[in-house]
Regions:
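Residue-level signal for protein termini and structural transition zones
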Residues: 52-55, 121, 155-161
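Long, compositionally biased intrinsically disordered regions
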Residues: 45-46, 52
Length: 161
């Protein structure tokens, strides 16, 4: 699920450029010598979508992030979408977040992220995880404060958000 959603999200972030999904950038040997590099390849361009529609999507996703306190003070330009998926009345909802960051220099997309927490109760918990991942990627916090070996405090244990 997360890799497929991340790929779809990249198409949104790039205003319609669909890339062949690759999980690897390169392979190196034990001395750091690059053995193989993997480039990205465009498989489709959604050119029939007007610019104003892309702008509305980007603005809407930016506003979603601004309404979630889990991202307050992150220091990274992030746009995203939250969600919950219900299984049944006997199990907690799955918590979901997809998002992308943009470069402060060029406003071009840098990273896409997809978090799914099975039976995670609320999307807020997925937002907390995404926040920690972004702090790690951008070196915004000491690794020891992010990777504690313990779960973060949940945002809510209600299954109806």
């Amino acid at each position: 699920f997360p890799t497929r959603r991340s790929s779809d999200l990249t198409a949104l972030a790039t205003s319609g450029t669909v890339y062949d999904l690759s999980l690897l950038d390169k392979v190196t040997d034990s001395q750091g010598k690059t053995l193989k590099e993997y480039g990205s390849s465009v498989v489709n361009q959604m050119s029939d979508v007007p610019d104003n529609v892309w702008n509305d999507i980007h603005e809407g996703m930016r506003r979603v992030v601004l309404t979630h306190e889990q991202f307050n003070g992150l220091g990274v330009t992030l746009s995203g979408k939250t969600g919950t998926a219900e299984l049944d009345i006997y199990h907690p909802n799955h918590g979901l977040f997809i998002g992308y960051t943009t470069s402060s220099d060029t406003s071009e997309p840098e990273y896409s992220i997809a978090v799914r927490i099975a039976n995670g109760y609320t999307s807020g918990n997925a937002c907390l995880t995404a926040n920690d991942i972004l702090k790690y990627i951008y070196n915004l916090a000491d690794e020891d404060t992010i990777l504690t070996g313990y779960a973060s405090s949940d945002t809510s244990n209600t299954s109806n958000d």
